[in-house]
UniProtKB/Swiss-Prot annotation:
<feature type="transmembrane region" description="Helical">
    <location>
        <begin position="259"/>
        <end position="279"/>
    </location>
</feature>
<feature type="short sequence motif" description="Integrin-binding motif">
    <location>
        <begin position="183"/>
        <end position="185"/>
    </location>
</feature>
<dbReference type="GO" id="GO:0042392">
    <property type="term" value="F:sphingosine-1-phosphate phosphatase activity"/>
</dbReference>
<dbReference type="GO" id="GO:0007165">
    <property type="term" value="P:signal transduction"/>
</dbReference>
<dbReference type="GO" id="GO:1902533">
    <property type="term" value="P:positive regulation of intracellular signal transduction"/>
</dbReference>
<dbReference type="InterPro" id="IPR000326">
    <property type="entry name" value="P_Acid_Pase_2/haloperoxidase"/>
</dbReference>
<dbReference type="GO" id="GO:0030111">
    <property type="term" value="P:regulation of Wnt signaling pathway"/>
</dbReference>
<feature type="active site" description="Proton donors">
    <location>
        <position position="200"/>
    </location>
</feature>
<keyword id="KW-0333">Golgi apparatus</keyword>
<dbReference type="GO" id="GO:0106235">
    <property type="term" value="F:ceramide-1-phosphate phosphatase activity"/>
</dbReference>
<feature type="topological domain" description="Extracellular">
    <location>
        <begin position="245"/>
        <end position="258"/>
    </location>
</feature>
<keyword id="KW-0378">Hydrolase</keyword>
<feature type="glycosylation site" description="N-linked (GlcNAc...) asparagine">
    <location>
        <position position="171"/>
    </location>
</feature>
<dbReference type="GO" id="GO:0060020">
    <property type="term" value="P:Bergmann glial cell differentiation"/>
</dbReference>
<feature type="region of interest" description="Phosphatase sequence motif I">
    <location>
        <begin position="149"/>
        <end position="157"/>
    </location>
</feature>
<dbReference type="GO" id="GO:0050821">
    <property type="term" value="P:protein stabilization"/>
</dbReference>
<dbReference type="GO" id="GO:0016323">
    <property type="term" value="C:basolateral plasma membrane"/>
</dbReference>
């Protein structure tokens, strides 16, 4: 009877990661849960802080000069965009979160997988982890992008059209022109200095590649072997088209788009493999030998155990 009570205590402790304090003191467990959630939100805020500061402040990009014969910045400014910022953000985030909601629902309620999170509801815990990791990567990707834009200050392909400098006051024979004044609208001129690297390319590649890897980890149905590769191909092509549209819209140079693709892919891989648990090996919780009830063992095993104890 004493061994049986000890077994029940071990099983109860294992429900909360082997911590009897959390089982006996729900208030302490709740305060710890709130503290961990606040810490996660703080980390998410800090990851996106550079992006927030740059987008909401008057920080101006690096004032880069130009060559009068540079044909790469003489393109006309197009009205409108093939894919504007609102569409990019809405589609990228909505598709990703809907996919995560569906995938975690299938994993928790259909495959009956459990979560070791301090959050009691396993579905809520799974959503919290996966959506949180995804948004954390979004914040990192956008912060990287904006830091590069203001630090490098590369001129967009339509820069001269937006800047509209007074060439009568510029001596093009000196080569590289640094002292010049733009007659165009200042806000548009500052935006025309943020070519490297493409934010559309980096954000679209991050969100779509994250989804590709998420499908690889969660989409385990073997009924149609080509369905998952088709979905993954479609997602990558959506990101690819988004980046290419920035070149045809005269918003970015091809190298800006390639750099954006590389940055988005790098952040997605780092988040998936080093932050999330999508590809981590699942471990099963095993009880210590002392928690095994002796009445469930055969007489041979009991004699063998007694022999080892005597030795």
């Amino acid at each position: 009877m004493q061994n049986y009570k000890y077994d029940k205590a071990i099983v109860a402790e294992s429900k909360n990661g082997g911590s009897p304090a959390l089982n006996n003191n729900p208030r302490k467990g709740g305060s710890k849960r709130v503290l961990l959630i606040c810490l996660d939100l703080f980390c998410l805020f800090m990851a996106g802080l550079p992006f927030i500061i740059i987008e909401t402040s008057t920080i101006k990009p690096y004032h880069r000069g130009f060559y009068c014969n540079d044909e790469s910045i003489k393109y006309p400014q197009k009205t409108g965009e093939t894919i504007n910022d609102a569409v990019l953000t809405a589609v990228g985030i909505v598709i990703a979160i809907l996919a995560i909601i569906t995938g975690e629902f299938y994993r928790i309620y259909y495959l009956k997988e459990k979560s070791r999170s301090t959050i009691q509801n396993p579905y809520v815990a799974a959503l919290y982890k996966q959506v949180g990791c995804f948004l954390f990567g979004c914040a990192i990707s956008q912060s990287f992008t904006d830091i590069a834009k203001v630090s490098i200050g590369r001129l967009r392909p339509h820069f001269l059209n937006v800047c509209n400098p007074d060439f009568s006051q510029i001596n093009c024979s000196v080569g590289y022109i640094q002292n010049y004044r733009c007659r165009g609208e200042d806000s548009k001129v500052q935006e025309a200095r943020k070519s490297f690297f493409s934010g559309h390319a980096s954000f679209s590649m991050y969100t779509m590649l994250y989804l590709v890897l998420y499908l690889q980890a969660r989409f385990t149905w073997r009924g149609a072997r080509l369905l998952r590769p088709l979905l993954q191909f479609t997602l990558i092509m959506m990101a690819f088209y988004t980046g290419l549209s920035r070149v045809s819209d005269h918003k970015h140079h091809p190298s800006d788009v390639l750099a954006g693709f590389a940055q988005g892919a790098l952040v997605a891989c780092c988040i998936v493999f080093f932050v999330s648990d999508l590809f981590k090996t699942k471990t099963t919780l095993s009880l210590p030998p002392s928690a095994i009830r002796k009445d469930m063992l055969s007489p041979v095993d009991i004699d063998r155990s007694n022999h080892h104890n005597m030795v």
